[in-house]
Every structure is written in structure tokens, then in C-alpha cells.
Amino acid sequence: MPNFLSNKPIPVADRLIMALDLPDVSEAKTLVERLGDAVSFYKVGLELFMSGDCFALVDWLKAKDKKVFVDLKFFDVPETVGRAVKALSRRGVDFATVHGNDAIMEAAARNKGSLGILAVTVLTSLDQGDLRDLGFQCDVQELVLSRARRALAVGCDGVVSSGLEVPLLRGEIDHELMVVSPGIRPVENRPEDDQKRVVTVDQAFRNGADYIVVGRPIRDAADPREAAQRAQAQIRDVFAAG
């Protein structure tokens, strides 16, 4: 098993990013309150943004001293993406995603301020068959590596990548590249869902991820706080073992 354990000065508790995949702000706030100090970093995505009052949620999270990752995968003409990123950076958000060509990624990076820009490589819900259906002639690893190299070249801070491809990134690209890995699933009782390229907490970090994003395994647990605490304990154990 590879060991590309991150040596970036990131507080261990911040390495777990909880995905607030919920239908409205009220439910999101209820879950945040329930999780308490078990989670310090939250991801807000399309579902919550479409529900309304999402910027009020972002401000509320920041007021509670939480870190915020806005995952909207900006993909529009470069001018529009640049302006959107600039507006978002004023909210004190920590990370945001972009999913486009070099010009789009460069516009985001140029207007980021203190915001960390993460380029999406290949969604964890896609596999090799899906790429073929989309017209790609390369394999998943080749596409992830190509997109990561281009993102770094135009000024992005990091990428979003399945933990399966992170060892390749660590072996081929500057170790300072920030890598956030979604698609985290438990070893046992792994649910059947739309995630196709998944890893465990331990695998993600040993493969070189700096952060992991966990949603359903915590959100849908009988006791979400206990599930989050268990994930945090796993992360502490990985870094303590080195």
C-alpha cells in the first residue's frame, strides 16, 4: 500500500470536510448544530444553493468559526467565472471548485483573492465506461493527470480527485498540489449508490489526499455525531502512525 501521507500544516480536525447535501438551510443548520465540534469544515453544494438563503448559511457557518467549501463547479465564459469567484471570495469562503478549460480555470485563479481554487478532475460517479460514452479516448488516470497538470499550470491551488488516482498525482506532480478526495466509503456495509470510484478514510490519506469529503456515511448514520467522531478518530490514527 502506498504511503504519500500529507505533510502540509493542516490541523488534523480540518482534514474532514462534511458535505451538507441537504434540501434546505434549516436542515443544514440542524445537522451542523448536532455535529458540534466533531466537524470544523463544511461543503455547500448545488442542492443547498438552489434552496435559497445559502449565503446566509455561509455567513452563519463563518460566524461559528467553521471553514466553508463552496462546490458549484464553475463552468461558464471566463469573464463570468472570474467575476463570480471574486464575489465569492468576499464572503470569506475557504475553497471553491471550477470545472472548465484553461481559460476558465485561469480566470478563477486570477480573481480568487484568499480563496483556494480547486479544479475538478473526473467526478467520482464516473468510470471508464462513462468516459467512453462522453467521447474520451483516454483512461481515467490519464485524464485526471492531464487536468491536474493544467490546473496547476494556470494557477489553481489544487484539485478534486478520487483517492484512487491520488498516488499517481503525488508521483507525477509537485507534492505541494492540494488534493481533496470525495467518494469516501467504509470498508464494511458499503452502500450501493452513485459513487463508482471510492476509497476508505485510511486509503485516501495514505494515497496522499490532504482533505477528504464525506457526506452520506455521516449524514445518513443513526448517530451522525458519532459517525463524524469515528471518522475523525480514523484520521488521527492515520497521521499518528505516519
From Swiss-Prot:
GO terms for molecular function: orotidine-5'-phosphate decarboxylase activity. Pathway: Pyrimidine metabolism; UMP biosynthesis via de novo pathway; UMP from orotate: step 2/2. The active site is at residue 73. It catalyses: orotidine 5'-phosphate + H(+) = UMP + CO2. Substrate binds at residues 21, 43, 71-80, 124, 185, 195, 215-216. It comes from the Bacteria. GO terms for cellular component: cytosol. GO terms for biological process: 'de novo' pyrimidine nucleobase biosynthetic process; 'de novo' UMP biosynthetic process. Keywords: Decarboxylase, Lyase, Pyrimidine biosynthesis. Signal peptide: none annotated. Its EC number is 4.1.1.23. NCBIfam families: PRK00230.1, pyrF. HAMAP family: OMPdecase_type1_B. Belongs to the OMP decarboxylase family. Type 1 subfamily. Catalyzes the decarboxylation of orotidine 5'-monophosphate (OMP) to uridine 5'-monophosphate (UMP). Homodimer. This is Orotidine 5'-phosphate decarboxylase. It comes from Methylococcus capsulatus (strain ATCC 33009 / NCIMB 11132 / Bath).
